[in-house]
Amino acid sequence: MRHRKSGRQLNRNSSHRRAMFRNMASSLVRHEIIKTTVPKAKELRRVVEPLITLAKTDSVANRRLAFARIRDNDIVVKLFNELGPRFVSRAGGYTRILKCGSRAGDNAPVAYIELLDRSVSEPEPTTHTNA
């Protein structure tokens, strides 16, 4: 029986799953939006949100806990210097999942997962000259 077993297996063994979510969490913190399948996005939310909650209180112990989970110093610095102060007044729910259709190759449902309150940079308008 499968009672009280939380989390999705995603057809991977445990070390592959841990490495995949470590990489996806790093990418999400670095770029603040990534595109992935819906089940992976829902599981990634369970990995990233506790890290952001940890980053709201800056201490050496919390930085070491975050480094133990992500293993990337640049990401830990961004978590504690940018994302922690950004979400200090929010009590959870730091990510948003936007479904965006299905993948062409295997018809898998695809979604964007993004951090809330991210700054969207406007592309500069290009001026075309007839030269």
Swiss-Prot record:
One of its GO terms (biological process) is translation. Gene3D superfamilies: Ribosomal protein L17. SUPFAM superfamilies: Prokaryotic ribosomal protein L17. Transmembrane segments: none annotated. Keywords: Ribonucleoprotein, Ribosomal protein. HAMAP family: Ribosomal_bL17. NCBIfam families: L17. This is Large ribosomal subunit protein bL17. It comes from Hamiltonella defensa subsp. Acyrthosiphon pisum (strain 5AT). The gene is rplQ.
